[in-house]
Amino acid sequence: MIIKFDESNHTVLPAFKGGQKEFSAHMFFDGTNRVFKGILVPGASIGFHKHEGNCEVIFILDGKGCVIEQEPDSEQTSREVSAGDCLYCPDGHSHSLMNTSAEGDLVFYAVVARQ
C-alpha cells in the first residue's frame, strides 16, 4: 500500500495531548493503526503521554527538537533529536516531542501500531 500524505486528511490539533501550540498532521488510519506525517512549528509540542496497547515509531525528517521519555518505574530522560533520528516508544512507556528551534519546523513520520 502506498500512502500519499499530500492527498490524505490534514488535521490541526491545538494543544495535542496537552502540548504547546498546534500539531499539524496528514493522517492515515486503517481502523487499527495510524501512520502520519507530522509538523511542529517552533515552540510547539506533543504533550507527555503513555502508550497503552500500542507502540510508536517516529522518524525525524527535518528540524531539531527534544524528546522526553520515561520507562515504567524510572525517571524521565530528555534528549535532543534531529533529522535522521528514529525514536521508539514501546507499549507501557511514555514520551513527548517538542520543536526547540527558534525557526524551522520539526517534520516527522510516525507509526502508532496496536500490540
Go through each PLM region and give its residues.
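A short, N-terminal "cap"/entry segment at the start of jelly-roll beta-barrel domains
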Residues: M1-R34, G47
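Short strand-connecting beta-turns/loops that link adjacent beta-strands
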Residues: G31-N33, G53, P72, A102-E103
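Conserved short histidine dyad/triad with adjacent acidic residue
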Residues: F36-E52
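Well-ordered beta-strand positions in beta-sheet-rich domains
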Residues: K37, S78-E80, S94
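Histidine-centered metal-chelating micro-motifs
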Residues: S45-G47, C66, D85-L87, D91-L97
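Glycine- and acidic-residue-biased ligand/ion/polar-headgroup-sensing regions
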Residues: G53-C66, Q70-E71
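Short acidic-glycine-tyrosine-enriched beta hairpin
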Residues: P72-P90
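Ligand-binding loop in jelly-roll beta-barrel domains
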Residues: S82-A83, D91-Q115
